[in-house]
């Protein structure tokens, strides 16, 4: 796997992955706080 093989910059992938994780964690904690976490 060479660093120049992909057309998408690594920082873009890392940013999207980070936002995805933050979103999932945020939804999880929001659901638990709202009391609907057990229904998921």
Curated annotation (Swiss-Prot):
Listed Gene3D superfamilies: 6.10.250.2070
Give the bilayer topology. Answer: Single-pass membrane protein
Cite a single GO BP annotation: photosynthesis
**What's a GO cellular component annotated to this UniProt protein?**
plasma membrane-derived thylakoid membrane
Cited Pfam families: PsbJ
Q: Where in the cell is it found?
A: Cellular thylakoid membrane
Q: Report the transmembrane regions from the record.
A: 8-28
Where this protein primarily resides, as one coarse class? Answer: membrane
Q: What does this protein do?
A: One of the components of the core complex of photosystem II (PSII). PSII is a light-driven water:plastoquinone oxidoreductase that uses light energy to abstract electrons from H(2)O, generating O(2) and a proton gradient subsequently used for ATP formation. It consists of a core antenna complex that captures photons, and an electron transfer chain that converts photonic excitation into a charge separation.
Oligomeric and partner information: PSII is composed of 1 copy each of membrane proteins PsbA, PsbB, PsbC, PsbD, PsbE, PsbF, PsbH, PsbI, PsbJ, PsbK, PsbL, PsbM, PsbT, PsbX, PsbY, PsbZ, Psb30/Ycf12, peripheral proteins PsbO, CyanoQ (PsbQ), PsbU, PsbV and a large number of cofactors. It forms dimeric complexes.
Give the similarity note.
Answer: Belongs to the PsbJ family.
The protein's name? Photosystem II reaction center protein J
């Amino acid at each position: 796997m060479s660093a120049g093989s992909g057309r998408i910059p690594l920082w873009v992938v890392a940013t999207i992955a980070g936002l995805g994780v933050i979103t999932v964690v945020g939804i999880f904690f929001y659901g638990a706080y709202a009391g609907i976490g057990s229904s998921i």
